[in-house]
Design a protein with these regions (language model features):
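Conserved ABC ATPase "signature" region
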Residues: 45, 60-78
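Conserved ABC ATPase signature
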Residues: 82-86, 90
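Conserved catalytic motifs of ABC-family nucleotide-binding domains
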Residues: 103
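Catalytic Walker B motif of ABC-type/P-loop ATPase nucleotide-binding domains
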Residues: 107-110
Length: 205
């Protein structure tokens, strides 16, 4: 069972109002959202709703932030496209732009590199690093790709199949023995020097 509390700046998030929560934290999930006749720009603009008035109208400043968010994920060229008709990789970039548009203090992303080709994967990780360093945003990312986590994370938390948890700096957690033990590697090993798993050589070679 899940228990405990989550605090942001010393305050439990369960005490936040819905608007306070939306201004503080944004979330990017892998599951697809269904939209009816919405352009990519419309979806990104949803990130500004916590800041709008009772009528939900966007100001000129909001429109500028929407454009900046689209530009940051290299999606200005598809801004007027129907969101339901774009590719999975493009959807991922638009959903990231929506999260950026919220101007959050914390952003949580569930496997954000899924569906992305190598170019857009690198661009996305670069954006997240920039948000963390320049904008002082706390970036929490779930990844299956250990090699990516080793390169971009300040701290990592690894969860094994048995629920065992390892937490710390990547260089302390991503060691051959720890990764092999945590994930029960039998048919291969983890090479901490290259940040990758390696198969055992076939017998007789």
């Amino acid at each position: 069972p899940i228990s405990g509390n989550i605090y942001v700046k010393g305050r439990k998030i369960s005490d936040f109002t819905s608007k306070e929560y939306a201004k503080t934290m944004s979330v990017v999930l892998t599951e697809k959202i269904k939209t009816e006749m919405m352009t990519c720009r419309d979806v990104v603009a949803m990130g500004r709703y916590p800041y709008t008035n009772y009528f939900g109208r966007l100001t000129k400043e909001d429109e500028v932030i929407v454009n900046e968010s689209l530009k940051k994920v290299s999606a200005l060229d598809i801004a007027e496209n129907d969101f339901s008709q774009i590719s999975d990789g493009q959807r991922q970039r638009i959903m990231l732009a929506r999260a950026i548009c919220q101007k959050p203090e914390v952003i949580v992303l569930d496997e954000p590199t899924s569906f992305l080709d190598i170019r857009h994967k690198i661009e996305l990780l670069d954006i997240l690093q920039e948000m963390a360093v320049k904008d002082n945003v706390a970036v929490i990312v779930s990844l299956h790709e250990i090699e990516l986590a080793a390169k971009i994370a300040d701290y990592v938390m690894c969860v094994g199949a048995d629920g065992k948890i390892e937490f710390g700096r990547p260089e302390k957690i991503f060691t051959d023995d720890r990764i092999s033990s945590l994930y029960g590697l039998i048919h291969g090993t983890y090479n901490c020097m290259y940040g990758s798993t390696e198969l055992k050589k076939p017998e007789g070679t």
